[in-house]
Amino acid sequence: MTAELDLVSITQAPKALLHDHLDGGLRPGTVLDLARETGYENLPAQDETALASWFRTAADSGSLEQYLETFAHTVGVMQTASALHRVAAECVEDLAADGVVYAEVRFAPELHIDAGLTLDDVMDAVLAGFADGERQASAAGKRIKVRTLVTAMRHAARSREIAELAVKFRDRGAVGFDIAGAEAGYPPTRHLDAFEYMRNANSRFTIHAGEGFGLPSIHEAIAFCGADRLGHGVRIVDDIDIGPDGTAHLGRLSSLLRDKRVPLELCPSSNVQTGAVESLADHPFDLLARLRFRVTVNTDNRLMSDTTMSREMLRLVETFGYGWSDLQRFTINAMKSAFIPFDERLAIIDDVIKPGYAVLIG
């Protein structure tokens, strides 16, 4: 018998998550605890409910730049090794409880050195936290593998150094590199040296592109930088024309992305909050899925969007009428696009994802 498509059953479904920011997924209670422990005095609210509401409301700005301002508070309490370890471990526990079986969680080490930690200290603390979180999830009967993407801030000038850090820690759980931050005025081509370094090291990278800026950002990420995946990439829809009869006509760039099977790390709720799309109903996710782009479902920032992978999937089901087979396809898309070795990806697809959905499909 096919399981009902509700939040409870979707939570049971195995999921793969490619785009989730560590500093965007803290528990509100943890933010309060860490603020007290570290002496951070700038929080806009002092109880869990009010703080969670503030983050969601502040993130609902319709502007990527204003959305990013909310991170001052989470980053502000993540300046010690113990804080980073706790946040990383809780991240894994929360994802596992939501049915995520594989995740690539990204963070920018350069944002966590204000209190004296080195970049290596930051990496050590986060990776140890992930490992402890995996062990705690396993003890609770949840199977999850978490790896990390080491992120450089696109407005800064440390991307080559951060790329080297990603390669240095690639045998300890860092599976790739990323650049993030405001797109407008900070094109990915400012960081060509970092991307060339990653390619020469036979390492993988994704680029935030096509979220707060349009097709030029996507074009540069693919044509000049050689991105393996696109963080968001939602504005690729601007290169697709829909004729009077409903037929889609792809431009050169959108055709290239589809032909090359470039994974799109789509984050529906976040895209509405930042103004990339007006509403979930206006999100091009369904169009891109029907045109067989490699679409994936992601959370982006669970605290700011008050979301989980299960909630993101449910919102897509409610908006576009998807069934279990669609959710399985999006999950397999994500797992195929992960930055871990092929045999590990295949094992998770064959041994975890397909059997898990088979039970739900009936």
Curated annotation (Swiss-Prot):
Catalyzed reactions per annotation: adenosine + H2O + H(+) = inosine + NH4(+); 2'-deoxyadenosine + H2O + H(+) = 2'-deoxyinosine + NH4(+)
Gene expressing this chain: add
Protein name, UniProt field: Adenosine deaminase
Entry note: cofactor: Binds 1 zinc ion per subunit.
Function: Catalyzes the hydrolytic deamination of adenosine and 2-deoxyadenosine.
Acetylation found in the keyword field: no
Sites annotated Important for catalytic activity: 232
Cofactor(s) needed by this chain: Zn(2+)
Catalytic residues as annotated in Swiss-Prot or TrEMBL: 211 (proton donor)
Gene3D superfamilies linked to this entry: Metal-dependent hydrolases
Coiled-coil region: none
UniProt-annotated binding residues for Zn(2+): 19, 21, 208, 300
Domain of life of the organism encoding this protein: Bacteria
InterPro entries per UniProt: A_deaminase, A_deaminase_dom, Ado/ade_deaminase, Metal_Hydrolase
One function term, GO molecular function aspect: zinc ion binding
Family: Belongs to the metallo-dependent hydrolases superfamily. Adenosine and AMP deaminases family. Adenosine deaminase subfamily.
Gene Ontology CC terms: cytosol
GO BP, sorted A to Z: adenosine catabolic process; hypoxanthine salvage; inosine biosynthetic process; nucleotide metabolic process; purine ribonucleoside monophosphate biosynthetic process
EC id: 3.5.4.4
Annotated source species: Mycobacteroides abscessus (strain ATCC 19977 / DSM 44196 / CCUG 20993 / CIP 104536 / JCM 13569 / NCTC 13031 / TMC 1543 / L948)
